[in-house]
Amino acid sequence: NLPKLPNSLTVLLCYNNNISILPELPHSLITLYCWCNKISKLPELPNLLTNLLCYNNKISSLPKLPDNLEKLSCSNNNIKELPELPEHITHIVCKSNLLIKIPKLPISNKLIYLDCSRNNLAELPRGISTIEKVIYSRNPIYKKIRKLSYLELYDINNK
């Protein structure tokens, strides 16, 4: 595991290291890349954090997301619920978890990319139509959506 981190640290790259516990994160941290470890719980996230890539771990829940967070990639974990989404979030990749719903989108909704495929989603939040790219395949919601008369579907699974 990692030692105490310097107070002035802005970028922490600790991916592919078999880490199970992260130490307290410095308030100056802007980028945290901790994918492909054995982390089950993240510490409190600094408010300056804009990029969080924590996919391929053993995380079951995320802490409160910082107000400045723009990019979140938390795929291939055991997350059942995402915390409230911050105003500045633009990209979320949360595929291959245990999610049953996506939280309400922020009023400012700056989200341009959402990949929530391979979860247990039965519904999508209001305002989803303003997002440029949404990937929601392999969710129970797919059965409801394909019944919409104005929607054109393309099956790309066997091509």
Language-model segments: residues:
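Low-complexity/repetitive intrinsically disordered segments
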Residues: N1-K4, T10, C14
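Canonical leucine-rich repeat
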Residues: L2-L5, L22-L25, L42-L45, L62-L65, ...
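Short "repeat-start/strand-capping" segments in structured domains, especially the N-termini
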Residues: N7-L9, P26-I30, P46-T50, P66-E70, ...
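Serine residues within intrinsically disordered or low-complexity segments
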Residues: S8, S20, S28, S40, ...
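Conserved hydrophobic beta-strand positions in leucine-rich repeat
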Residues: V11-C14, L32-C34, T50-C54, L72-C74, ...
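Leucine-rich solenoid repeat scaffolds
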Residues: L111-K159
